[in-house]
């Protein structure tokens, strides 16, 4: 099966096959969310709050606890909820080899593209340094990505009795400019919340994400680099699926030979039928394993180091530039 690779643009989910979305033959829709922000903004804690369990390492630390892009999956409202936590790869001024690798991993884990890019910013003293980090992220993703972005303000509990609108009115001008960039699409989060408050803020955020997805016509954010990476992932997924298919055929041929060898020496017809029934059961067992392997092939591909090398090679051939990696 040949995989055709197109150009940049917005990808409607309905136009993609199930294995492109990582759910071969299951038909489960995905909602892919990426956490972006400066080191120490609280991305990992936010990811844990969204997923409802501690799956990302988080804590108070001067250095980033998250060292590599990590992907965790849960279910919500009949969808596969995919959350990708990113390290401080967007803090670096000039991407080095490690940064390039993490950018590649980020694209591989979110391909064919995220539905929502959450820029995590803690409430409090929004400094010029923090503003520069925010602008760097916005610049790297380009104007096209704004339609898919939500400003997620953490440390809601620090507001205490202060009204959020009053807080925003008194915020520095450059922070208000960021709010304008996001068309006032923001959500407040308290990562220390528990019980009803925790569930309510999760519902508010995911409802906002769903609303944004509808506004975007059910499309995910993509561009030429995503298209190139998705093409590589699809090709490798199909290659792995074909290897599993060949393995199944070899196994079935071996089982058939063994049982036919046994059956030919049997004179009792009932015993022959029993052996044939056993053979069919073994066939079904192998086919069940094959089906599971087929469904998980894409996830296997995404988790190999080889796929990162293949994507980087494809990007080098296409002359993509890492420090402009998300621009149109």
Swiss-Prot record:
Expressed in thymus (in thymocytes), spleen (in splenocytes), lymph node and lung. Expressed in B-cells and T-cells (at protein level). InterPro entries: G_AIG1, GIMA/IAN/Toc, P-loop_NTPase. Signal peptide: none annotated. The keyword Lipid metabolism does not apply. GO terms for molecular function: GTP binding. Residues 233-262 form the IQ domain. Residues 85-88 are annotated as: G3. It comes from the Eukaryota. Phosphorylated at very low levels in resting splenocytes. Rapidly and transiently phosphorylated in response to splenocyte activation. Phosphorylation is increased in cells undergoing apoptosis. Belongs to the TRAFAC class TrmE-Era-EngA-EngB-Septin-like GTPase superfamily. AIG1/Toc34/Toc159-like paraseptin GTPase family. IAN subfamily. Interacts (via IQ domain) with calmodulin/CALM1 only in the absence of Ca(2+). Interacts with BAX, but not with other Bcl-2 family members, including BAD, BAK1, BCL2, BCL2L1/Bcl-xL and BCL2L11/BimEL. This is GTPase IMAP family member 4. It comes from Mus musculus (Mouse). The gene is Gimap4.
């Amino acid at each position: 099966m040949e995989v055709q690779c197109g150009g940049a643009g917005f990808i409607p989910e309905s136009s993609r096959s199930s294995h492109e979305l990582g759910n071969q033959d299951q038909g489960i829709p995905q909602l892919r969310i990426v956490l972006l922000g400066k080191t120490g903004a609280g991305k990992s804690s936010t990811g844990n709050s969204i997923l409802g369990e501690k799956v990302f390492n988080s804590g108070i630390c001067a250095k980033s606890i998250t060292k590599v892009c990590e992907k965790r999956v849960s279910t919500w409202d009949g969808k596969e909820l995919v959350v990708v936590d990113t390290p401080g790869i967007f803090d670096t001024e000039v991407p080095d080899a490690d940064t390039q690798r993490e950018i590649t991993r980020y694209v591989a884990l979110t391909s064919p593209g995220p539905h929502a890019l959450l820029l995590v910013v803690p409430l409090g003293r929004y400094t010029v340094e923090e503003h520069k980090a925010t602008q760097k992220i916005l610049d790297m993703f380009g104007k096209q990505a704004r339609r898919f972005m939500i400003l997620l303000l953490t440390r809601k509990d620090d507001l205490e009795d202060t009204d959020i609108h009053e807080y925003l009115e008194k915020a520095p001008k450059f922070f208000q400019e960021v709010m304008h960039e996001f068309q006032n699409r923001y959500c407040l989060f308290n990562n220390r919340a528990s019980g009803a408050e925790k569930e309510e803020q999760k519902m508010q955020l995911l409802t906002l994400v769903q609303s944004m997805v509808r506004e975007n016509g059910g499309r995910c954010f993509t561009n030429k680099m995503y298209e190139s990476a998705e093409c590589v992932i699809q090709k490798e997924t199909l290659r792995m699926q074909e290897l599993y298919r060949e393995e199944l055929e070899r196994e079935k041929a071996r089982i058939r030979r063994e049982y036919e060898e046994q059956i030919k020496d049997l004179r009792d017809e009932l015993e022959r039928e029993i052996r044939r029934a056993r053979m069919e059961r073994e066939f079904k067992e192998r086919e069940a394993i094959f089906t599971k392997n087929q469904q998980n092939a894409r996830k296997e591909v995404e988790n190999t180091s080889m796929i990162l090398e293949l994507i980087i090679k494809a990007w080098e051939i296409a002359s993509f530039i890492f420090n402009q990696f998300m621009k149109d």
